[in-house]
Amino acid sequence: MSRAMSLKAKIRNIAKQKNIPAQVILQNYMFERLLVRLAESEYKKKFVLKGGMLVAAIVGLDNRATMDLDTTLKSLPLTPEAITGAMQSICAIESDDDVAFEVGTVTPIRDDDIYGGYRMMLNAKYDTIVTPLSIDVSTGDAITPNPVEYTFSEIFDDKKSYRLWAYNIETVMAEKVETILRRGVFNTRPRDFYDTYILATTQEFDKALFTEALMATAAHRGTTEQIADIPTIMKNIEESAELHTMWDKYRKQFAYAEKIDYTQIVAVINNLIE
């Protein structure tokens, strides 16, 4: 059996166990191999993890699938040259996993969000398998109070782990809730709702610190006044037929969300921000 076939067999087994598409497992495995190298590099403290990859690490891949990686830079300029140089250095670190990384393009992020950054494309190569990876890099986020060092378990062997700097859970939730309030009924990202719900209902967190982080995030993003009328915003979100429909589609798409009703999510968010 070739190395590629052997890896695919291991991935299929885990995909079956966790009820997750095999492509998601493959993508996350390749991200893991990159992050293991980051953990061994001089840039360990300079790339702070956030977003879906961090949520998946906290609640488990079987409770949150993700296909991308989000980071915030600390003590490193947010320029294509600095990002490329750092990533080339990280990818050059040798490991016994036989994965090779090819650094690709760095382009400005032009998403519908209010803060910028860059998207870096890489290819992860293992035998005949080539997996494209996308990493979003931003800077200047309000992390309240500070990043925390977090232990990430490896996909194929949860006795093996690596440590990286990441957002504290209160800041993760604050960014999600600020986005929900800011976008209101125009939100097109059901994962914002899911992430807020799953973190608030399964993890321990400091509610006062969450509130402080929410205020700091809104101040940083310039949305303090925009999200000030929380009762009206939440009433509109609760009554939005479009958001109900969007959530129902998400539930059908992901097994881990199928038993969560939209009204439960709204109740959890209301409880967070009351």
Task: Give names to the regions the model predicted.
Residues 1-47, 56-65, 69-274:
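Structured mid-to-C-terminal alpha-helical surface segments
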